Design a protein with these regions (language model features):
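Terminal amphipathic alpha-helical/low-complexity segments used for targeting or macromolecular assembly
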Residues: 1-44, 48-50, 90, 124, ...
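Short-chain dehydrogenase/reductase
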Residues: 52, 72, 126, 144, ...
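Flexible, glycine/small-residue-enriched loop-and-beta-strand segment within the central core
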Residues: 56-67, 72-138, 164-166, 170-175
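Beta-rich strand-turn-strand
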Residues: 129-153
């Protein structure tokens, strides 16, 4: 109970500081978008030291995003984490990559309800530009996802996946 209270208190403090800082930036005028985004990312998402995170990266539900080690998040990435998203060490997301844990339950009544499944990305994974990773997917360590691939099912370790047909082109040799 004590740890939960501490966690809630820390989150509240971070959000309070970010909002206060945001008001200060509004007073400063235009051109402060980068500073605001950097402050927002650092306050709401616990990114490990040595990581690179472009200021244009969008985090939805940042409390569900967990990093195990260094990551590189390129411009235009969107991480929608209604359910947990876990990153391994030395993970690279190229420009415009989307990770989305939520989808709609179209079998139910209107309005459709959101359902969310976790995403797990292993160590040493490289995801190519403009790829989309959907909920319920686990990407094994040392895998490479080519540009523009929509990943809707799990990928084993040491795999290379390319093309719109989700083709495994080869298994990488272990290091």
């Amino acid at each position: 109970m004590k740890n939960k209270f501490k966690s809630v208190a820390e989150s509240f403090f971070r959000i309070f500081i970010v909002r206060y800082f945001f008001r200060m930036l509004i007073k400063l005028g235009s051109g402060c978008g980068r500073v605001w985004t950097f402050a927002k990312v650092r306050a709401l998402v616990d990114i490990p030291k040595g990581s690179n995170c472009h200021w244009s990266v969008v985090f939805k539900y940042p409390e569900n995003i967990h990093f195990s080690g260094r990551v590189m998040l390129s411009p235009g990435c969107v991480i929608g984490a209604m359910s947990p998203v876990s990153f391994g060490n030395e993970v690279r997301l190229s420009q415009g990559v989307h990770l989305e844990t939520a989808s709609l339950d179209v079998n139910g009544d209107l309005p459709y309800k959101h359902i969310a499944k976790p995403i797990t990305i292993g160590d040493g994974v490289w995801i190519g530009a403009h790829s989309i990773i959907l909920g319920g997917v686990s990407i094994g360590k040392n895998s490479v996802i080519g540009a523009g691939v929509v990943v809707s099912k799990s990928i084993p370790e040491n795999s290379i996946v390319v093309g719109p047909g989700f083709r495994f082109i080869e298994r990488k040799e272990k290091y």
